[in-house]
Design a protein with these regions (language model features):
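Zymogen propeptides/activation segments of proteases
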Residues: 2-7, 22-406, 413-576
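Sec-dependent signal peptide hydrophobic core
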Residues: 5-16
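Cellulosome-associated attachment modules in secreted, modular CAZymes
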Residues: 8, 19, 23-30, 575-641
């Protein structure tokens, strides 16, 4: 992942800083006064390389008054524009492309028509998001996107994310043929059927670009494989949705003999329930046609996930519509039931049908084995497929038994479709896991803020709202951003606790569940797409932005303060809102201590945002306890709050 620091200031504060920096004695007759755009560019560390770039920035300043914020990386690339992008509404993808054209000089794009092509148009409750891909000499650059976010109600383009790569060059002549690449794929994936290919430029970070063959297969779970077109190394295998033939004949299936209480796989003591199956000829198929959910099983009942890919022919079937004669049939029914619940959660809360919002076919594998043909203790998302291990059988039951585990894996498929984070490491990888945990917790609807409690048999039958001693991940345990800087080495799951603990604090601060989950889902509209792009700072900004979108009443400012307080709790700060920094100078010292003491004594009033910064122990109060904490910090007695 490219190491860089994003620099972002509001228009008002940046121009004030620039004015202070630029106020120097001028010789008599000098008239070369910096323009407003030049002042703003200087304040955020942006070098304007042309008059056209200056004009583009000037136009943005003119139409935004005080609402503009621009982010720039260390390579002088504009990565984000938060503010009104045009005075004209956006009603089509062509309009969105025109927005990019108007800012192309800032983004470093030489030829918009040649280098940028529409990839996707998606909608949430509040926004319409136009996603464009970058091309180089006619070849797609994988993981390089520009997104334009448009308010659905007003039609205003109000946000832009860019991972466009400028000043780029690579040899586009492959050293191996596509047939050689096909052979590599066939050797690894046991002769799966190949249905297409193209030549692309592949990158997982902004410093390592490779010419690659993208091989498309018709397998479920491995539908795109990237093969280095020079070395023949497999760079990545990835899943995208492919259209499959429709299935008809829907009927209701009810099974009261699923599992006994001692080996409970479903919550709330539910043992009789409905799932949808379909019938063709004399066979019944475990597939929910309306939701496009298909239960597939390994026909050998013994293979590990890494050694086979399911096809539609692997759908679980029965002659008598009694899917209860074996463990795998019972697991299949339970998986379909629980995934149906998660599907309905995303649909009812966000209008998001299926993993991709388009109700595309989704495959569920309930009987994955370990690499040693033993019982697998894990679960995976593979884009258009979910895979569940059966658990070790002694202390664990199926990993499909816990609704938040299914919500987690389903969430991976959703974020994979919306922001393409799959396979990322570092902070993006941590975000990928955090969002999955957050969605899983809200699907569970218990607010215990623990993932995977129900897979453990010792927790069976216990009150689901009480905290358990055994779980996969405990989101109530605080992890501070400033305590770990290398998020690659500590791993995605451990790093994810920074952001998932933020969600826990949003809940503790009183943001109700139906509002909070909409905030998190809507925040995906504002986050950078592609592998290894998004950071924790991006997440804070996106969640604050989403809060302003979701909460449209008088309580908006109160909710924004709560969200910022939750991020402060894990030390993911705004530049101007560091906890305890009441002087707003980016550091904690005796000057902040003086202001805090005055506030506690009642001789100085604080705004709601300042009160959130002054509440160092996060107890909802500003009192002597906060003074003691800050004093000990200033004296060097403690290093954290």
């Amino acid at each position: 992942m490219k190491s860089y620091t994003k620099k972002m200031l509001s228009l008002t504060s940046s121009l004030l800083i620039a004015a202070q920096q630029c106020f120097v004695a001028m010789p008599a007759g000098a008239v070369d006064t910096p323009s407003e755009a030049e002042n703003y560019a200087q304040s955020i560390g942006l070098e304007l390389n042309s008059s056209a770039a200056e004009d583009a920035l000037s136009d943005l300043i003119d139409i935004n008054d005080e609402g503009l914020a621009v982010a720039v990386d260390d390579n002088n690339n504009v990565t984000q524009i938060d503010g009104l992008l045009s005075n004209e509404t956006v009603d089509s993808s062509n309009d969105a492309k025109d927005i990019i054209a108007k800012t192309s000089e800032l983004l470093g794009i030489d030829n918009v028509n040649r280098e940028i092509r529409l990839d996707d148009v998606s909608e949430s409750d509040y926004n319409k998001v136009y996603t464009f891909k970058q091309f180089y000499q006619g070849l797609e650059m994988v993981n390089s996107y520009i997104t334009v976010v448009v308010d659905k109600e007003t039609g205003e383009a109000e946000f832009l994310n860019s991972s466009y790569v400028s000043d780029f060059s690579i040899n586009t002549t492959p050293a191996i043929s596509v047939q050689q690449a096909n052979n590599v794929v066939n050797e690894k994936f046991n002769n799966i059927s190949i249905i297409g290919y193209d030549l692309v430029i592949y990158s997982e970070n902004d410093n390592d670009f490779k010419l690659a063959w993208r091989i498309k297969t018709d397998a479920i779970g491995v539908t795109e494989v990237y093969v280095d077109a020079v070395t023949s190394e497999i760079l990545k295998d990835i899943v995208v949705d492919e259209a499959l033939s429709p299935v008809y004949n829907n009927r209701i299936y009810s099974n009261s003999l699923l599992l006994n209480y001692s080996d409970k796989i479903l919550p709330d003591n539910v043992y009789s329930f409905d799932v949808d199956v379909s019938k063709e000829g004399s066979l019944y198929y475990l597939r929910d046609i309306g939701r496009n959910l298909y239960v597939c099983v390994d026909p050998s009942y013994s293979r590990a996930k890494s050694s086979w890919a399911p096809y539609e022919s692997h759908i679980l079937k029965s002659y008598n519509n009694q899917f209860n004669s074996s463990e795998v049939e019972q697991l299949g029914v339970a998986v379909l039931y629980n995934v149906k619940r998660v599907y309905d959660f995303f649909n009812s809360n966000f209008g998001h049908k299926g993993f991709d919002g388009k109700n595309s076919k989704f495959y569920l594998v309930p009987n994955v084995k370990s690499t040693t043909n033993g019982r697998e203790s894990n679960a995976w998302s593979a884009g258009n497929a979910l895979w569940f291990g059966e658990g070790n059988g002694a202390t664990e039951q199926s990993f499909a038994s816990d609704i938040d585990v299914i919500g987690h894996e389903f969430g991976h498929s959703v974020t994979g479709s919306k922001v393409q984070w799959g396979g990322s490491n570092g902070q993006t990888g941590a975000l990928n896991e955090a969002y999955a945990d957050i969605f899983g917790e809200y699907c569970d609807n218990t607010r215990e803020w623990q993932i995977g409690t129900d897979i453990y048999k010792k927790n069976t039958g216990k009150n689901t709202t009480n905290k358990k001693t055994t779980c996969i991940r405990d989101l109530t345990i605080r992890k501070n951003h400033n305590k770990s800087t290398n998020y690659v080495s500590i791993g995605n799951h451990e790093g994810s606790k920074v952001i998932s603990h933020t969600a826990y604090w949003m809940d503790k601060l009183g943001i109700e569940a139906n509002t909070a989950v909409k905030i998190w889902f809507t925040s995906l509209d504002y986050l950078p797409k592609g592998g290894n792009k998004a950071t924790f700072d991006d997440c804070r900004k996106a969640v604050v932005r989403a809060t302003q979108k979701v909460v449209q009443n008088k309580a908006q400012s109160e909710y924004v303060v709560k969200v910022k307080t939750a991020f402060n709790r894990v030390h993911v700060y705004d530049n101007n809102e560091i906890i305890g920094d009441l002087c707003h100078d980016g550091k904690l010292d005796s000057f902040d201590l003086v202001i805090l003491k005055q506030a506690v004594m009642g001789t100085k009033s604080l705004t709601p945002a300042e009160r959130a910064q002054a509440d160092l122990n996060f107890d909802g109060k500003v009192n002597s306890a906060d003074v003691t904490l800050l004093q000990n910090y200033v004296l060097g007695k403690i290093t954290d709050f």
